Amino acid sequence: MLLSGSSSQSLAAALAAATGERLGDVTYDSFPDGEQLVTVPPAVDGERAVIVASTPTSDAHIEVLQLQDAARDAGASEIITVLPYMGYARQDDAFDPGQPVSARAVARAISTGTDRVLTVNPHEDGVLECFDVPAAGVDAAPQLAAPLPADLTDPVFLSPDHGATDLATSVRDAYGTGVTDHFQKVRHSGSDVTVEPSEIQTAGRDVVVTDDIVATGTTMSEAITALDDPARVFVATVHPLLAGSARLKLARAGVEAVYGTDTIECAVSEVSAAPAIADAL
């Protein structure tokens, strides 16, 4: 049985359709002081419970822990926790003295209530090692090729840095044509950083900028404005957080369209990560 977090209801429904698993009747309540309460159906007794819940907020993390506890208490035979988007995963190190490794802290908490974890395109694969139970990544990047225009002109698929070229390659391979490259960050001083493409020529070509997460859109917008006269620019991201004025920044930088998956359910969630998750289950 699939048990959805409140932030992943559409994705859970798509996953139910893809797998044929029942979609549990979960209810979400809150108290006047802000505390949350979830309720799972008693029919989960003796069944495998697959919890599907992105955690873009701290409240969402609490909800996952409650879903796990409720499912276990209701008699679930096995619990698999699917984190389409894992919050705090970018804090995978103590970057300054006295700071926690937040990814490890939340992974340990989630591990206590589950038998296995799946998460979609984690920011760093090393995050998977933070869990105390078997954990695996799911690649939903190929899904992002589907909404791209079929008539891209000599397309270039760009990643934000060399370390993320695999994601750009996944989208390019799924699209079927084009080349991949990556932006380069050049640090001139402690606060002066410029972002520019490698040697690839973009003039007159369609450019697809790919990334696992687009949060504020600031760095990506700066990178896009550094491109040399591209024909069209599109952004494809697995996790479209698009915080604050991110969408406006990208539009002002010349981005024609933004395509994301439903790991974060929003207006640009053009494709679902459900097929990739279904394969992993």
From Swiss-Prot:
Keywords (A to Z) from UniProt: ATP-binding, Cytoplasm, Kinase, Magnesium, Metal-binding, Nucleotide biosynthesis, Nucleotide-binding, Transferase
GO molecular function, one term: kinase activity
A biological process term (GO) from this entry: purine nucleotide biosynthetic process
Protein name: Ribose-phosphate pyrophosphokinase
SMART domains: Pribosyltran_N
Entry similarity comment: Belongs to the ribose-phosphate pyrophosphokinase family. Class III (archaeal) subfamily.
A Pfam entry, by short name: Pribosyltran
Cofactor binding remark: Binds 2 Mg(2+) ions per subunit.
SUPFAM superfamilies, per the entry: PRTase-like (SSF53271)
Active site: K185
Residues involved in Mg(2+) 2 binding: D161
EC numbers, comma separated: 2.7.6.1
EC class: transferase
UniProt KW Metal-binding keyword: yes
Species of the source: Halobacterium salinarum (strain ATCC 700922 / JCM 11081 / NRC-1)
Protein role: Involved in the biosynthesis of the central metabolite phospho-alpha-D-ribosyl-1-pyrophosphate (PRPP) via the transfer of pyrophosphoryl group from ATP to 1-hydroxyl of ribose-5-phosphate (Rib-5-P).
Protein residues bound to D-ribose 5-phosphate: R187, D211
Keyword Magnesium included in the entry's annotation: yes
InterPro entries assigned to the protein according to its UniProt record, in alphabetical order: Pribosyltran_N (IPR029099), PRibTrfase_dom (IPR000836), PRTase-like (IPR029057), Rib-P_diPkinase (IPR005946), Rib-P_diPkinase_arc (IPR037514)
Swiss-Prot/TrEMBL cofactor(s): Mg(2+)
Protein's pathway: Metabolic intermediate biosynthesis; 5-phospho-alpha-D-ribose 1-diphosphate biosynthesis; 5-phospho-alpha-D-ribose 1-diphosphate from D-ribose 5-phosphate (route I): step 1/1
